Amino acid sequence: MTYTLVIVESPAKCGKIEGFLGPGYKCMASYGHIQQLSNLKNIDMENNFKPTFEHIDAKKMQITKLRKAIADSNNVMLATDDDREGEAIAWHICEVFNLSIHHTPRIIFHEITKDAIVRAVNTPTTLNMPIVHAQQSRQILDLIVGYKISPLLWKHISRNSKKGLSAGRCQTPALRL
């Protein structure tokens, strides 16, 4: 039987979504991010800070399950959360599974009700790439700031303390370090 695969972040949503949409739909979860920037080596500083994402080890089994479900489906709809992280997760799903960012439907809903889900399925959009780029920029900055400044804190400030210090893009200005 062919079906449309709806990919969400949380498996808790799947039962209700499948119930609302009926037998022509199957819902699966990514369980959040499936790729990451694990260290500074994943950022090409000489090439406009181009990131190279890696599969998250703990998600390899889920990636395999999603790959099979995508292959068995006749259509895929991305239904990750309506925020920067959700948009980035949807983009990673497209990248990992070779789905078109321009033609894979992106559905957005803010409540798990039949009306909201059906409305989202009937009015799909596409990935919001400016939001994806904003999330990637934040992630890259977090890595650069954290990896470059935290060791300085360890060396110069926390050497007499048993507590480790760290620096981040948001926490450093917020705490006036």
Which residues does each PLM region occupy?
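Prokaryote-biased recognition of long, low-complexity C-terminal linker/tail segments
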Residues: 142-177
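Intrinsically disordered, low-complexity regulatory segments
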Residues: 1-145, 173-176
